[in-house]
From Swiss-Prot:
One of its GO terms (biological process) is phosphate ion homeostasis. Residues 330-346 have a biased composition (Basic residues). Glycans are attached at N38, N68, N116, N194, N240. This is Secreted frizzled-related protein 4. Residues 292-346 are annotated as: Disordered. It comes from Homo sapiens (Human). Residues 292-303 have a biased composition (Basic and acidic residues). Residues 178-307 form the NTR domain. SUPFAM superfamilies: Frizzled cysteine-rich domain (SSF63501), TIMP-like (SSF50242).
Length: 346
């Protein structure tokens, strides 16, 4: 009896720690690979425990998606079968909005009824959240906030990762071909890169879910800057590259400066990862103050320029136009008129 309880307890701890340590995974469902998000978590809203099970289930809707009966059908299906994994909702995947479900159903159900099918009960819209009353996603709600000058990159297999069977193309990739550029921790770098988050973290694990998808799980200790809330727990940093830059290893204590994109924390080539030092963290705070000061200066100059242009209207450029000379015909008429009015005396 005691042994069975101990085994059950160990199994529960293993599952609990496993879920906490690897909350997100790359989307591998073919229908959903071009969605605005590329990481998901299982189980999904239809209780599929793995993406392999979800792939088998979602295939039944491929023909319906191909006929393009609704502009939001693919989005809705992927939000159900491969829900987006975000920092704020690691334990409860976000559901699609009720309005998205209703649009997809109303658009496609007439076509389904022509073939004696109705909208499936598993995709019922009634239990889904309304946009202004709960948390949900819709195509209109997803925006891109990654700076345009940041290179979008893919991920490499040359790291300590959670193993999955590698594709043939993945095995051909060699770590030796990757040359990472060193990003120096200076004020000039900080001002030019304009990072959206700065954290002190410990690297917990690096997990691969394909040759072009790597998730670095870090334990956040301190938050110095963020554009959206970052929980002080284990969070995923997403890289999408054939080369792992900057290169990091598990168990390192580091300061990370990088970008947030679609509510996800990224780990990209121009990001800065340095061994943790108190002095460097103090510098980063000073650099952020300089960045904000620089922004205020630019805004003040724009306001001053706007007030000046309103109070002093622009003067016309160039010399004023010269008066046009009278035409020869008018001069002739004028002289003839003068002759008639003033005849010569004999």
């Amino acid at each position: 009896m005691f042994l069975s309880i101990l085994v059950a307890l160990c199994l529960w701890l293993h599952l609990a720690l496993g879920v906490r340590g690897a909350p997100c995974e790359a989307v591998r469902i073919p229908m959903c690979r071009h969605m605005p998000w590329n990481i998901t978590r299982m189980p999904n809203h239809l209780h599929h425990s793995t993406q392999e099970n979800a792939i088998l289930a979602i295939e039944q809707y491929e023909e319906l998606v191909d006929v393009n009966c609704s502009a939001v059908l693919r989005f809705f299906l992927c939000a159900m079968y491969a829900p987006i994994c975000t920092l704020e909702f690691l334990h409860d995947p976000i559901k699609p909005c009720k309005s998205v479900c209703q649009r997809a159903r109303d658009d496609c159900e007439p076509l389904m009824k022509m073939y004696n099918h109705s909208w499936p009960e598993s995709l019922a819209c009634d239990e889904l959240p309304v946009y202004d009353r709960g948390v949900c996603i819709s195509p209109e709600a997803i925006v891109t906030d990654l700076p345009e000058d940041v290179k979008w990159i893919d991920i490499t297999p040359d790291m300590m990762v959670q193993e999955r069977p590698l594709d043939v193309d993945c095995k051909r990739l060699s770590p030796d071909r990757c040359k990472c550029k060193k990003v120096k921790p200076t004020l000039a770098t900080y001002l030019s890169k304009n990072y959206s988050y700065v954290i002190h973290a410990k690297i917990k694990a690096v997990q691969r879910s394909g040759c072009n998808e790597v998730t670095t799980v870090v334990d956040v200790k301190e938050i110095f800057k963020s554009s959206s809330p970052i929980p002080r727990t284990q969070v995923p940093l997403i890289t999408n590259s054939s080369c792992q830059c900057p290169h990091i290893l598990p168990h390192q204590d580091v300061l990370i400066m990088c970008y947030e994109w679609r509510s996800r924390m990224m780990l990209l080539e121009n990001c800065l990862v340095e061994k943790w030092r108190d002095q460097l963290s103090k510098r980063s705070i000073q650099w952020e103050e300089r960045l904000q000061e620089q922004r205020r200066t630019v805004q003040d100059k724009k306001k001053t320029a706007g007030r000046t242009s309103r109070s002093n209207p622009p003067k016309p450029k160039g010399k004023p136009p010269a008066p046009k000379p009278a035409s020869p015909k008018k001069n002739i008429k004028t002289r003839s008129a003068q002759k008639r009015t003033n005849p010569k005396r004999v």
